[in-house]
Every structure is written in structure tokens, then in C-alpha cells.
């Protein structure tokens, strides 16, 4: 098997739980056999302050993002991203002055992944409102990553598409970070088709599933009940599913969302195509609140993230759990191995 280069983890918002869960995840990850080393991207001062406050092992500066360099260090390897924390980090109190360092960590991770210096990028949570105040022009990580990768070819349909996985369930969203009223207007045949094609290709390439089975969630109660409760299934979703099947993609007609996620139904598909954010995230987080993973499909790089936010309310208390970050690391390595 090909020996993978390190897996990079971007710092996230330094006032959130990102530095804490990265430090904790590294302690667990370094004891595992057969996995590439974890390296953190950001300002080492943020990690050092967190380690000192919580009694965790001190991080170490990483001069070069190589496997050999990372494996020689006795603390979390932190690769400098060229932008320092501009304001003192106060757990639970984000500062827009530090958004530039947060952004630089993501950009550095993408650059290293595109150059093949890291096998995958795992992103710790950012605070969208803080980033917006600092001039960040993207709805979230997913869209920003797509922009950074826009000039690079993809093996298959180009994304991005957001997959959430946990508890044996995979869902992929047609609309992502949109208010529900706006999301309804964005559920077009083109978007649904693109999401299904990206998902089918990713399940083959990144998950090793030779013949992926997709389930399509309906929009209306009871999937419209034959038009009695809405026409979107009849007019948009079912005809599109028929066209996709004619092209060799195994996808169901629109299914009632309220019966799509129980154990017996989940056994019949490899991923569910969900039309808006909460339709997909509620079942995943219900099944696996602490271990859910966000996976960006249709990029030239491997990117995953924990399926939770910055958790400012518990930052600095030492109680943040690294479970979802560890699951994101595991998933990133599996995908990187499939692509290797």
C-alpha cells in the first residue's frame, strides 16, 4: 500500500474548540499504527496557549510539512501559515482580527493538498459570522474550498457537493447553507442532477463502491402524495430520476422523507440525496451526534471536517470531545487510500 503523506488539520477559529480538539486528537492519533501523521496548520501561539491552559502536551513547530519531520516531534506538529494571531485569544470570545489567520490556515491546507504535500485536509470549525465581518465572501468552507480549487481538474463531475456521514448513513445536500425560503427556489432539475452525478462518481472513486445506490428524498409531505400535497415530485424529481437511471445511475424516485432514514430503509441505499440542509443533517446528527463527518465531494483534494461548530460556549473549559474530528481524520485517510 502507498505510504500516505501527512493529513493536515486547519486551526479553525482560535477562540473556539478547534485548537483543543486538534491537540486531543493528536494524542490519540499518534498512538495508532499504519496511519499518516497529523499536522496542524495555523499559529502555534494559539495551540500553545490552549495546551498550557488545559494541561495538554505542548505543540512543536514543524519546519517542513513532511512525514519524516512530523514523526520526529514529541508534540503536535504545527506548520506556520505565514499569518499570526493579531489579537489575544479569549476562549469563547471570537475576534475578527484573527480571521486572517483562520483563512490563511485553510488556504495553506489547500495549497499543500494540491501540491501533494499532504494527503488530505481536515478543517476545524470556523465562525461564519466572524469571517463575514472580516470580509469573507463565501457562505462557508465548502464554497471557499471550491473557489481555491477552481482551476484544477477533477477526476469526474466537478463539485462542490456536501456529504454528511454518520451512524451508517450518508446524505448529500442539493442546497447547503441557504435560508429555507431561498433553498426552495434553488431546488432545480440542474442542481439535483449535478448533485446526483457528483455523488455517484464520488461513491465509486472515494468509497470504492462499484455500483452505488442512491435514494432521492422528496420535498413535500409524503413525497407529494401523487400531487395532492405538491407537484415538485411529479414535475421535477421523478422525471429527473428516470433520466438518471437511463444514464446508468441507480437512483430511486422521490421518497417520503419521513420514512427514508429508519434502519430498514437505510439498508437499501449507499447515499441519500437530500434537498435542503436540515433534511439531511437532522437524521445524521440524530444517529451519530458526536461522530458525524462532513465530506466535500467533487474536489481535486480530499477534504473532511467534524460535523459540529466552534462551540464557543464550552471553549477553554477542557470538556470538548475530539470524537468527530477523529472520525473526520479516519474518513479522510480512507478516501486518500482509495485515490492512491
UniProtKB/Swiss-Prot annotation:
Residues that coordinate or bind substrate: 141-142, 285, 294, 303
Positions of a divalent metal cation binding: 177, 222, 277
Associated pathway: Cofactor biosynthesis; pyridoxine 5'-phosphate biosynthesis; pyridoxine 5'-phosphate from D-erythrose 4-phosphate: step 4/5
Keyword 4Fe-4S assigned: no
A Pfam family of this chain: PdxA
Biological process terms in GO annotation: pyridoxal phosphate biosynthetic process; pyridoxine biosynthetic process
Record EC number: 1.1.1.262
Cofactor comment: Binds 1 divalent metal cation per subunit. Can use ions such as Zn(2+), Mg(2+) or Co(2+).
One MF annotation (Gene Ontology) recorded for this entry: 4-hydroxythreonine-4-phosphate dehydrogenase activity
Catalytic function, reaction form: 4-(phosphooxy)-L-threonine + NAD(+) = 3-amino-2-oxopropyl phosphate + CO2 + NADH
Note: The active site is located at the dimer interface.
Function: Catalyzes the NAD(P)-dependent oxidation of 4-(phosphooxy)-L-threonine (HTP) into 2-amino-3-oxo-4-(phosphooxy)butyric acid which spontaneously decarboxylates to form 3-amino-2-oxopropyl phosphate (AHAP).
Listed name of the protein: 4-hydroxythreonine-4-phosphate dehydrogenase
Species this chain originates from: Maricaulis maris (strain MCS10)
